Each structure stands twice: as structure tokens, then as C-alpha cells.
């Protein structure tokens, strides 16, 4: 099973994903492929697989990627090989944007997909972005806030839409969703 967490940058996807992995057995994350520069705290091969633009584009040409998109001038995508291998052993939890979610729902026929969209009020989103450790510039904050309306307009793609106001509560709800969906 593949559990997709979506929401705009700052919605809490990564924090929730890490907490779910800590609390639940047999659930893992897989790294995304990206061309963005490595940041402090990134673990190559675990959080991301860092590629040059040329390497990423070669993987696209060779049909090695299920979905990809460009955010803030960098490619992000999901490796077919990694997802196929890991999903045989584990439930995979992955944070993916709305475009990637749509593509995976169209493409993956042999893996059960559960999609969860995390909502956060726009004002709260700005506050979270401004308080991040890797605080984005004002220009990046504006770009991410502009993306908010687009992402919110696509919530019909999702099986579940949760308002993420309280981490503990949201994680508990997602744990229950995963348990219930695993039974089906």
C-alpha cells in the first residue's frame, strides 16, 4: 500500500510522515529523486537521491520515474524501481504534491493508494514558513502562498482531507486511516 500525504509547503507533511514511521510497524518512506541542492539535515539516499538535471532528465527519457514535477526550478520525482521494490515489503508513506498524486493514481494499478490532503489556513501557513529552521526568503514564501490556492482547488483528488491544527491529533487520525485501509 502507498499512503500519499499532500498539502502545501509548511502543512506538516514531513513532520507527520516521520511521526507515523516512528509509531507504526512495517511502514517506511522512500526517498524522492531531486535536482535541488542538498540542505543541512538531508541524508543522501534516505531523504532524497540527489541528481544533476541531466541525470534526472535521462531517467525521464528512460521511463524510470512514475511522476515528476518542477518546484522552484528543481525537479522532484518518484523512482519506479525504488517504489516497486519497497512496496513489496512495506506500506510506503510519501509526501507528494497534487500533480504527482494525480499521476500516481492514473499510473499505479498494482499498488493500493490511499491519499490524504493536509489543510492548513493560509495565515497559519505563512507563520509556519516564517518560523522554519531553513527559513525561505520572502520571495519563496510568496511563491509558496501563491501555490496554496492551486493545491486547495485540487482536494477532490483525495480520499481524506484533514485540517492539521494539532500534530498529535492529526497523527492519530492518520494512524487509524492506515490501519483501516490495510484491512480492506
Question: Where are the regions that the model predicts?
Answer:
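ATP-dependent small-molecule kinase phosphotransfer cores
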Residues: 28, 34-92, 98-100
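P-loop (Walker A) phosphate-binding loop of NTP-binding proteins
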Residues: 8
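A glycine- and Lys/Arg-enriched "phosphate-lid" helix/loop adjacent to the NTP-binding pocket
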Residues: 36-40, 87, 96-98, 102-156, ...
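Walker A/P-loop
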Residues: 13-14
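Post-Walker A helix-loop "phosphate-sensing" segment adjacent to the P-loop in P-loop NTPases
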Residues: 22-30
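Hydrophobic anchor at the beta1->P-loop junction of P-loop NTPases
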Residues: 5
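Phosphate-binding beta-loop-alpha motif at adenosine-nucleotide cofactor sites
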Residues: 156-170
Amino acid at each position: 500500500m502507498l499512503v500519499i500525504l499532500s498539502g502545501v509547503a509548511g502543512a506538516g507533511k514531513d513532520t507527520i510522515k516521520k511521526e507515523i514511521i516512528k509509531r507504526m510497524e512495517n511502514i517506511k518512506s522512500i526517498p524522492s529523486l531531486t535536482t535541488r541542492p542538498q540542505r543541512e539535515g538531508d541524508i543522501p539516499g534516505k531523504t532524497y537521491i540527489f541528481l544533476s538535471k541531466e541525470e534526472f532528465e535521462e531517467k525521464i527519457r528512460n521511463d524510470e520515474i512514475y511522476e515528476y514535477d518542477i518546484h522552484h526550478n528543481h525537479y522532484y520525482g518518484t523512482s519506479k524501481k525504488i517504489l516497486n521494490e519497497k512496496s513489496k515489503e512495506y506500506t510506503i508513506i510519501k509526501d507528494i504534491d497534487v500533480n504527482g498524486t494525480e499521476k500516481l493514481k492514473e499510473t499505479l494499478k498494482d499498488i493500493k493508494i490511499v491519499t490524504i490532503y493536509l489543510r492548513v489556513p493560509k495565515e497559519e501557513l505563512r507563520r509556519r514558513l516564517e518560523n522554519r529552521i531553513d527559513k525561505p526568503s520572502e520571495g519563496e514564501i510568496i511563491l509558496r502562498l501563491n501555490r496554496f490556492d492551486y493545491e486547495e482547488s485540487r482536494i477532490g483528488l483525495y480520499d481524506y482531507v484533514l485540517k492539521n491544527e494539532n500534530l498529535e491529533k492529526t497523527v492519530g487520525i492518520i494512524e487509524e486511516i492506515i490501519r483501516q485501509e490495510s484491512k480492506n
